[in-house]
Regions:
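A beta-rich soluble binding module of mature secreted/lumenal proteins
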Residues: 129, 138-144, 176-186
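Solvent-exposed loop/turn segments at secondary-structure junctions
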Residues: 75, 92-93, 133, 160-164
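Low-complexity, intrinsically disordered terminal/linker segments enriched in charged
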Residues: 156-186
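N-terminal signal peptide c-region/cleavage motif recognized by signal peptidases
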Residues: 8-12
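Early exported N-terminus immediately downstream of N-terminal targeting peptides
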Residues: 17-98
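Surface-exposed, charged secondary-structure patches
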Residues: 96-139
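Bacterial N-terminal signal peptides that target proteins for export
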Residues: 1-2
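Short beta-strand edge/turn micro-motifs at domain boundaries
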Residues: 138-166
Length: 186
């Protein structure tokens, strides 16, 4: 057991000291290496692609934090079961959406630009990226990350100027109002 810990320690230390930019770049490169050249295959085998997306997102996203953020002020009054159920449903919705996007969006290149802005807090970072479509149009993407348990985790994404976290929070708030604040109906 001690030998195994000694062998794993450098890998764990590397993961904990990896910069936000390196974490995003490594995750994207690893994921894309699994699907590049196999787009037609995955278009016909969506469950396999979903499994890859799930694995990739689980490595980088803080779904518990994202779920709490999307629930906003409603999070405090939700039961632990309601919080957990929402986080699971939200996570699956993101995986399904991302999977469909991978199959339908025609892109040529993904460029991680790096950490561009100074942050107010040491446990927060932003990493910018560009998605270059086949027609040459460039879509900016900005990942917001926070340091949690020694690892950088994605907590929000802004795509082409649209803040997804804020959009989902507004949708959740509206759904709660439409359903008389019934967590189970939302």
């Amino acid at each position: 057991a001690l030998a195994a810990m000694l062998l794993l320690a450098p890998l764990l230390a590397q993961a904990q000291t990896q910069s936000p930019e390196e974490m995003i770049r490594d995750n994207i490169e690893s994921f894309m290496s699994q699907i590049n050249g196999k787009e037609d295959y995955y278009a016909n085998n969506l469950d396999e692609l979903k499994a890859l997306v799930n694995e990739s997102l689980n490595e980088v996203a803080d779904f518990r934090y994202i779920g709490a953020s999307v629930m906003g002020s409603y999070f405090r009054n939700a039961t632990p079961e309601q919080r957990s159920r929402f986080a699971d449903v939200f996570r699956q919705t993101l995986i399904d959406t991302y999977t469909r996007g991978l199959v339908t969006f025609d892109y040529d290149e993904l460029r991680v630009l790096g950490q561009q802005r100074a942050q107010r807090h040491e446990d927060q970072a932003s990493v910018d990226m560009e998605v270059v479509a086949s027609n040459g149009q460039v879509y900016p993407v900005s990942y917001s990350l926070r340091l949690s348990d020694g690892q950088w985790r994605v907590v929000n994404v802004i795509v082409n100027g649209i803040n997804l976290g804020l959009t989902f929070r507004n949708q959740f708030d509206q759904a709660m109002r439409d359903n008389n604040r019934d967590y189970d109906a939302v």
